[in-house]
């Protein structure tokens, strides 16, 4: 009977430990309007001590790079690449055998967008990798969704085709 109780207790404790998975990075996301017909999707992360989040464009042979992934973007298009902001650390990593770029403490990733229609619907996510000195988390997604009226795109501008310009007749030679 003691063995069964001990086994059940160990199973219960291991289940409780599994339920409290490590979440060393907490992200917030928001849409910031810029001038005219542009905006930016901002992902801001707070990183626990001892952990780091990898930067963008690290290549295929290393850890998971931070990437912007569009599920559905209607009425907007991306402008440029995902841009990391913060104090980026660059150093050789023995575990991966390569020079890596990462952030500790905090990081912000920004994706600029441009509105193309009078209304928009955005469904996207940031994917990132995080490690400490002993382990790495599986690739993690930070979802972002938003919809609304575009700030600087009118119905006319969105549907208007370029106007044909009449050419002036050539001057006659005398």
Predicted stretch roles:
Residues 4-17:
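Sec-dependent N-terminal signal peptides
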Residues 18-174:
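Extracellular/lumen-exposed scaffold segments
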